[in-house]
Amino acid sequence: MGQLGALLHLVDPTLPIGGFNHSNGLETFVQQGKVNSRASLEEYVQTQLMQNWIYNDGAYLSLAFDAMANHDLDRLLQLDQELAASKIARESREGSYKLGVRLLKIFIRYENHPLLSEFQQAISEKRCQGYFPIVFAMVAQAMNLDKAETLYAFYYNAAVGVVTNGVKLVPLSQMDGQDILFALRTPLAQAVENSLNPDLDWLGAATLASDIRSMQHEQLYTRLYMS
């Protein structure tokens, strides 16, 4: 039961890291009329899951989890730098490492793991940024969480964020949002299966439409979100 509690704490939406402030380009899609219904929001989140997250944040989380298990700080720093290069839009890039730094600040107070301290020192020395998926993986492994369950929780947390933001932005009913989440159960499990041993040739696969909307977000006339 202790591991379940730790995992629930790690994905708790009330963690004071600011995740609710970011739409990662969804706000642009809505303002341009590309996402305007329950069906289009469901298509959007499933596309993000199966064509973006499993090759980017999820894949790097998986690799960082393994590097943490192997006590390989150099590999963690390398993965953090590679993930930085894959995040084209400034707002999304900055948002991710700000979330990561805040997450590390919370959990390092309770998890006495030397690599967490060394990674935090590397951030302060500008040797890495501390991107959210990397830190998430490190904290999860430090708490001896199961890798597959960690990936599922990460993807589910990301999906909930998209659906919550979409319900607010379109707008849609709360029940529409719940229906979308119910429909994600099988895709989430498939995403986890695909991410347990990522294909290195697909790391950082581009999602041009999302990257463009994330960059356009900076120029929107009105904005509810920081990205």
Curated annotation (Swiss-Prot):
The record's note on quaternary structure and interaction partners says:
UreD, UreF and UreG form a complex that acts as a GTP-hydrolysis-dependent molecular chaperone, activating the urease apoprotein by helping to assemble the nickel containing metallocenter of UreC. The UreE protein probably delivers the nickel.
This protein's source sits in the domain of life called: Bacteria
Q: Name one GO molecular function term.
A: nickel cation binding
Write the gene name: ureF
Please identify the protein, giving its name as recorded.
Urease accessory protein UreF
Predominant localisation class: cytoplasm
Q: Does the keyword Cytoplasm apply?
A: yes
Species assigned in the record: Actinobacillus pleuropneumoniae serotype 5b (strain L20)
Please describe what this protein does: Required for maturation of urease via the functional incorporation of the urease nickel metallocenter.
- Offer a single GO CC term for the protein: cytoplasm
Q: Which HAMAP family does the UniProt entry name for this protein?
A: UreF
List localization entries.
Answer: Cytoplasm
Alphabetical UniProt keywords: Chaperone, Cytoplasm, Nickel insertion
Output the InterPro entries linked to this UniProt entry.
UreF, UreF_sf
Q: Which family does it belong to?
A: Belongs to the UreF family.
